[in-house]
Amino acid sequence: MTRRVALATAVVFAGLAAGAAAAPEAASPPLAKLVGARLVVGVDSTTASPSLLARIRRGQVGGVILMGSNVRSAPQVRALTTSLRAAATIAGNPLLVMTDQEGGTVRRFRWAPPSASAEELGSLGEAAIRRRGHETSTALERLGVDVDLAPVADVPSVPGSFIAAQHRGFSPVPTRTAKDVTAFSAGLLDGGVAPALKHFPGLGLATRSTDDAAVTIDAGASALAPGLVPYRRAIAAGVAPIVMISNAAYTAYGGQPAAWSPRVLALLRGLGFTGVTVTDALEPLATTHRVTLAQAAIRAARAGVDLLLFVGPERSTAAVYDALLAEARAGRLSRAGLEASAARIEELAATYAG
């Protein structure tokens, strides 16, 4: 059993959602490091560019995401993640390596499980779903991946749901989705990989993907409540170390994109969630709302999202880092908020990274 699996197994049985012990006091880190820890960036090719490795060594990047374009073979991926980790080790900074391995059509490593979609997995029962989660995490851990941006916790309960059309939801029944999401998440943790439940507070009522359009879910809080059921259960079970925040806007929660909404973040924390939050890819949000990448990131950071996710060219995020650092130095991003996010990210990395 690897150290990561042992730690992750302890998390499952201890119940992470009940809250973790506070970290010992230490000297305040510089703003540059606090800002860098929050950026998750894409990799431009099947190898890491010199500029990306340099940014990791300088502490300007806290994580990377691997997409299909970064994948040629298992040995190649392992060499890539090893080089990324080596750069982080030189700097003494944690680095989270992420991917999307939901199953079905959303699978960056085509040879790795789960081959079945969430919809197909939903017919297998909780024990089998947990096994599939464990198989997935075992494969990802061998590749050097720490975080799976899965499972989808959305409840596709309306006609025309894009989640249902893409077979990405476990069930239209909230309690069934809750059980299946909890089982798959527990399976990922069994193998030492952190799950990231998505897309809070739910995309089950959306008929279009936020990757393609600005989406507003015009529903009351009572209509949205069933979409919170999977999160409540997974948080209570201690199998939700990470939650991804939706790019959709919700009229019930103020009408701005959830990733920019302090109200949505407060709703999640009110469910007892003490882990790390991450945005969905910020490029589509910036495009559909006609703002720069830096503006999209700043708004999410101000709302309280911990990790800011970018899947496009790595070089495009250098200006984002500079803009965030300028906001921090001007006091428009509070040090207290930056330190709180950094503490959550460091705890996550201590358990799963490497």
Tell where the protein language model's regions lie, with residue ranges.
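Glycine-rich, aromatic-flanked loop segments that form ligand/cofactor-binding clefts
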Residues: R85-P114, I129-P156, T177-G202
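Second-shell residues forming the walls of enzyme active-site clefts
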Residues: L31, S51, R72-R85, T89, ...
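A charged helix-plus-loop insertion that forms the helical arch/lid used to bind
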Residues: P113-G125, R168-S171
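Hydrophobic faces of well-ordered beta-strands that scaffold small-molecule active sites
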Residues: A37-V43, G62-L66, L95-Q101, V147-P151, ...
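N-terminal hydrophobic targeting/anchoring segments and the immediately downstream early-domain regions
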Residues: A23-W111
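Preference for extracellular/luminal or secreted protein segments
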Residues: A23-R58, R107, T288-G354
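Secretory targeting and sorting signals
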Residues: T2-P24
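Short, conserved phosphate-binding/catalytic loop or strand-edge motifs used
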Residues: V155-A164
